């Protein structure tokens, strides 16, 4: 799950190699910014390396929670298409067999506003499970349904289903995932409870 980067600076051919305990391009960029600030203040490179290698990231950002049937289980707070694209990039750069994205859209208004964009990015996962929309106190005045998203995803990827409860999603995942698959819950609502329950046993 680790990644490494080599440090170069203007006028200097090579500084050092640093291992990160987190994945994703955004974490590389954040690490480079932190390194630049540390070097500006003449902090020893070994101290920088030690700090970055022990950093495990923030909660709910491509957070590894454990395993289910030998499959890696992650959670991510992403709830906007651009954030989901970043999550997708992290998933695809992580070594695994098949991936399963469990997506819960956050609010009816956001769902209707970004319906096509959600479908476009989610269709790039191997398998997609749509969870019930999280209303967050909103009334569904747009009459948007989970099936609207499923239908759009199906135009690009037939491996998508809607399950109307977290319990059904958990049972489905436990029946289909195996060693070295990757499962990720995506959304700002309580969908992360699915990931937590999957790794309990």
Set out the residue ranges of the language-model regions:
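Short polybasic amphipathic segments
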Residues: 2-10
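Short hydrophobic segments within beta-strands
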Residues: 102, 131, 185-186
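A glycine-rich beta-strand to alpha-helix segment
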Residues: 167-199
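Nucleotide phosphate-binding/pyrophosphate-handling subdomain across enzymes
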Residues: 11-127
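C-terminal helical cap/extension that packs against the catalytic core
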Residues: 119-179
